[in-house]
Amino acid sequence: MAFLQDGNHTAVTEFILLGLTDGPILRVILFTIILCIYLVTVSGNLSTILLIRVSSQLHHPMYFFLSHLASVDMGLSSSVTPNMLVNFLVKQNTISYIACSIQFGLAAFFGTVECFLLAAMAYDRFVAICNPLLYSTKISTESCIQLVVGSYIGGFLNASSFILSFFSFIFCGPNRINHFYCDLAPLVELSCSDVSVSVVVTSFSAGSVTVITVFVIAVSYSYILITILKMHSTEGRHKAFSTCTSHLTAVTLYYGTITFIYVMPKSSYSTDQNKVVSVFYMVVIPMLNPLIYSLRNNEIKGAIKRQLGKKMFC
């Protein structure tokens, strides 16, 4: 049953996710591609976490943050990808009201934690390059734990505002969500109640997270750039730039897609374009992050070689 009679209203008890496409051939192709991406995402991020845990050379603050980023990337992708894969296999993919709220909240939680972790990693690079003598004091084990715990608390608070908004919506008519997961915009379109307050609350909450984290990242890299330009050694400049390149690439990809989805006016792009960008944001980027951080990081590449060497000679 998709609807439940409640007094003068018909309450929606489940939703239908329309997914990415109706074409049977395209569905098979997309299923194969996204399944491969998801498997690479899980294996790549798990490998990153395990490598950092077993390699004493990687027991540094930067890699502590990176291990949590890998965990969050797996969570972000897993909040939507398995259900999306099911959508390709069934004729009509339904999701219950409660399951929709959980998916909605998890996507908001992991997306928010990623923002805070990227900001924490930018601050870590700022201290390492601009104040190297104070690095061990400012980025202590206790400080790292506080920054990570703060990131998860921030994610929980922002996700709570999204979930509370979801439960304030009244769905009494159409139940077809034109997306591959329960996102805010299509849910707002389906609601038959006044959503103005809820939209303001979620916009303020998500907007605050974005502004705060972007500000921290921008200020950190402004000081980093100034410090690098003042360096007289070409080798020192190259080393400083190389430590920041991976993180800057990840930040650009992540915030670039967030800007397209949540900041640009909805009239400037179609729903289908939004779906494609959402796939990149929630499915592709979590796969790319381990590759971005490992391919340009000599310490990680060295740790991989050492672990492979141990396996070969055991």
UniProtKB/Swiss-Prot annotation:
Q: Among its keywords, does the record have Membrane?
A: yes
Please give the GO cellular component terms listed in this UniProt entry: membrane; plasma membrane
Localization terms from the record: Cell membrane
- One BP term from GO: sensory perception of smell
Cystine bridges: which residues? Answer: C100-C192
Where are the Cytoplasmic topological domains? 50-57, 124-136, 221-240, 296-314
Report the main location listed first in the record.
membrane
Question: Per UniProt, which keywords does this protein have?
Answer: Cell membrane, Disulfide bond, G-protein coupled receptor, Glycoprotein, Membrane, Olfaction, Receptor, Sensory transduction, Transducer, Transmembrane, Transmembrane helix
Annotated SUPFAM superfamilies? Family A G protein-coupled receptor-like
Q: Which InterPro entries match?
A: GPCR_Rhodpsn, GPCR_Rhodpsn_7TM, Olfact_rcpt
| Glycosites | N8
For membrane topology, the record states: Multi-pass membrane protein
* Transmembrane is among the record's keywords: yes
- Domain of life, per the record? Eukaryota
Q: Where are the transmembrane segments?
A: 29-49, 58-78, 103-123, 137-157, 200-220, 241-261, 275-295
Query: Which GO molecular function annotation, any one, does this entry have?
Result: G protein-coupled receptor activity
Q: Which Pfam families match?
A: 7tm_4
Q: Which segments sit on the Extracellular face? A: 1-28, 79-102, 158-199, 262-274
Provide the family line. Belongs to the G-protein coupled receptor 1 family.
The role this protein plays is: Potential odorant receptor.
Query: What is the designated name of this protein?
Result: Olfactory receptor 5P69
* Source organism: Mus musculus
Gene that this sequence comes from: Or5p69
